[in-house]
Amino acid sequence: MIKVAVNGAAGRMGGRLITAIKETEGLQLTGALEHAESPMLGQDAGLTAGCGPLDVLISSDLDEVLKATDVLIDFTFPEVSLRNLEACVRHDKSIVIGSTGFTPEQRARVDEMAQNIPVVLAPNMSVGVNACFKLLKEAAQILGDGFDVEIVELHHNKKKDSPSGTAVRMGEIVADALGRDYNKSAVYHREGMCGARTPEEIGMQTVRGGDIVGEHTVYFIGMGERIEITHRAMSRDMFARGAVRAASWLAGKAPGLYDMQDILGLK
């Protein structure tokens, strides 16, 4: 039995994760974490998630929770994820990170600490999105430089980072396939007399509104034709299922940094 703890247990994603763990054979929820000021501390994590009592109380004591845990799942914010990663290194525990918005410096810190323990870091745990990643690479390689690339992503009005980590990863995959530097090719804003589009640009547009779970479309636009690769998330359950699959896969792996492409055998 793989023992799993969830950080951000009282949040929307945390509830989905707890439910998915309960429904997955071979996994056991052994810890549920929230920040020290959370009004949900001391509550049964299963009742909070809406999946019935689990006799696991929500706590803010990360070190104590990790003592009884094999894998920690963290969908929070980069600063929190880094602190939790450091704790996992201290306790020699594995971690699945679904947080997005890491700076280059923060990402370098993740890379460094992943030399000590198994780490899954993925901007999107959805199987469908990761299939799209593979399709984007193949499409870019086939189409080459003759098609302009634009990316549009939509999310709910509570999302804090922009563009989404998934959209950035899509841009990176396309740029790599075309032999470009994503950081030099990405264009996040166009306004006024900004001049004609250059062939190297990868445009990135963001929409925020309502309760959109997540939608990403990559446009390959040529002369007289257009290809669109779109993924639409209907609920957060698919992200939770992917994260739980990652936790199951990660148990017993060698130290290193992995992503969903490793887990799905797409590399």
Swiss-Prot record:
<feature type="binding site">
    <location>
        <begin position="8"/>
        <end position="13"/>
    </location>
    <ligand>
        <name>NAD(+)</name>
    </ligand>
</feature>
<comment type="similarity">
    <text>Belongs to the DapB family.</text>
</comment>
<dbReference type="InterPro" id="IPR022664">
    <property type="entry name" value="DapB_N_CS"/>
</dbReference>
<dbReference type="GO" id="GO:0009089">
    <property type="term" value="P:lysine biosynthetic process via diaminopimelate"/>
</dbReference>
<feature type="binding site">
    <location>
        <begin position="165"/>
        <end position="166"/>
    </location>
    <ligand>
        <name>(S)-2,3,4,5-tetrahydrodipicolinate</name>
    </ligand>
</feature>
<comment type="function">
    <text>Catalyzes the conversion of 4-hydroxy-tetrahydrodipicolinate (HTPA) to tetrahydrodipicolinate.</text>
</comment>
<keyword id="KW-0220">Diaminopimelate biosynthesis</keyword>
<feature type="binding site">
    <location>
        <begin position="98"/>
        <end position="100"/>
    </location>
    <ligand>
        <name>NAD(+)</name>
    </ligand>
</feature>
<feature type="binding site">
    <location>
        <position position="156"/>
    </location>
    <ligand>
        <name>(S)-2,3,4,5-tetrahydrodipicolinate</name>
    </ligand>
</feature>
<dbReference type="GO" id="GO:0016726">
    <property type="term" value="F:oxidoreductase activity, acting on CH or CH2 groups, NAD or NADP as acceptor"/>
</dbReference>
<dbReference type="Pfam" id="PF01113">
    <property type="entry name" value="DapB_N"/>
</dbReference>
<feature type="active site" description="Proton donor/acceptor">
    <location>
        <position position="155"/>
    </location>
</feature>
<feature type="binding site">
    <location>
        <begin position="122"/>
        <end position="125"/>
    </location>
    <ligand>
        <name>NAD(+)</name>
    </ligand>
</feature>
<feature type="active site" description="Proton donor">
    <location>
        <position position="159"/>
    </location>
</feature>
<dbReference type="GO" id="GO:0019877">
    <property type="term" value="P:diaminopimelate biosynthetic process"/>
</dbReference>
<keyword id="KW-0457">Lysine biosynthesis</keyword>
<dbReference type="InterPro" id="IPR023940">
    <property type="entry name" value="DHDPR_bac"/>
</dbReference>
<dbReference type="InterPro" id="IPR036291">
    <property type="entry name" value="NAD(P)-bd_dom_sf"/>
</dbReference>
<dbReference type="InterPro" id="IPR000846">
    <property type="entry name" value="DapB_N"/>
</dbReference>
<protein>
    <recommendedName>
        <fullName>4-hydroxy-tetrahydrodipicolinate reductase</fullName>
        <ecNumber>1.17.1.8</ecNumber>
    </recommendedName>
</protein>
<dbReference type="InterPro" id="IPR022663">
    <property type="entry name" value="DapB_C"/>
</dbReference>
<keyword id="KW-0028">Amino-acid biosynthesis</keyword>
<comment type="pathway">
    <text>Amino-acid biosynthesis; L-lysine biosynthesis via DAP pathway; (S)-tetrahydrodipicolinate from L-aspartate: step 4/4.</text>
</comment>
<feature type="binding site">
    <location>
        <position position="34"/>
    </location>
    <ligand>
        <name>NAD(+)</name>
    </ligand>
</feature>
<dbReference type="GO" id="GO:0005829">
    <property type="term" value="C:cytosol"/>
</dbReference>
<keyword id="KW-0560">Oxidoreductase</keyword>
<keyword id="KW-0521">NADP</keyword>
<dbReference type="GO" id="GO:0050661">
    <property type="term" value="F:NADP binding"/>
</dbReference>
<keyword id="KW-0963">Cytoplasm</keyword>
<dbReference type="Pfam" id="PF05173">
    <property type="entry name" value="DapB_C"/>
</dbReference>
<dbReference type="GO" id="GO:0051287">
    <property type="term" value="F:NAD binding"/>
</dbReference>
<dbReference type="GO" id="GO:0008839">
    <property type="term" value="F:4-hydroxy-tetrahydrodipicolinate reductase"/>
</dbReference>
<keyword id="KW-0520">NAD</keyword>
